[in-house]
Amino acid sequence: VKGVTMLLEEILKQEQERFIKENLLSDEMLELLKENIMPFNTLMAYYRCAIMEVETKFKVLNEEFSLQYDRNPIESIKSRIKSMDGIFKKAKKKNIPITMEGIEEGIRDIAGVRVICSFPEDIYMLADCLLKQDDVVLVERKDYIKNPKPSGYRSLHLIIEIPIFLQNEKKMMKVEVQLRTIAMDFWASVEH
């Protein structure tokens, strides 16, 4: 029984490797992944820290508006880190080198924060408040509210750089911030 179990485990492992090779990654990508797994995990941890920084900034703004104006402009805050598979697919599509530097420089939406607002005017007010903070750097702005996509998609996208403070250094990390209303978020989920 023990031998059969070991044989089944080995077959399962081989099938998993075959599936990965055939469906997700080439041998070259698999080797790069094995060589870079620790730096990649570290980079993903940095992105998670950057998300926490951005979420905190929006929570503070929401609290401030609650105290000053007796209302909350933010309905919800959602965040995500792009999956490893998503990162590799985007890198391949955009001809970005599969290196830590290539990924960090070439893919700007690895970390994402979506802020759902009650009203359209809240979107611009929150974006302005965020961008006025002296540790936030605007890298790119795409206004799909004023210029909707042909599909009807509407949202304000900001690529920002924000510092994370590590044990011995400060590191600037890119985060994509999407601001939209509840109605725009519903449309985006239907459209996607």
Predicted regions span which residues?
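A glycine-rich, hydrophobic loop/mini-helix early in the fold
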Residues: 64-110
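Solvent-exposed alpha-helical segments within well-ordered globular domains of core cellular machineries
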Residues: 52, 56, 85, 89, ...
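Phosphate-end processing signature that detects enzymes handling 5′-triphosphorylated RNA
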Residues: 11-14, 97-101, 148-150
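Short, Lys/Arg-enriched N-terminal segments with co-localized hydrophobic residues
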Residues: 1-5
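Terminal, regulation- and interaction-focused segments at domain boundaries
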Residues: 110-117
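An acidic, glycine-/histidine-flanked metal-binding catalytic module
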Residues: 7-51, 58-64, 176-192
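Glycine-rich, low-complexity intrinsically disordered segments
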Residues: 20-24, 42-46, 73-77, 103-104, ...
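Long beta-strand-rich cores associated with HINT superfamily self-processing modules
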Residues: 104, 117-192
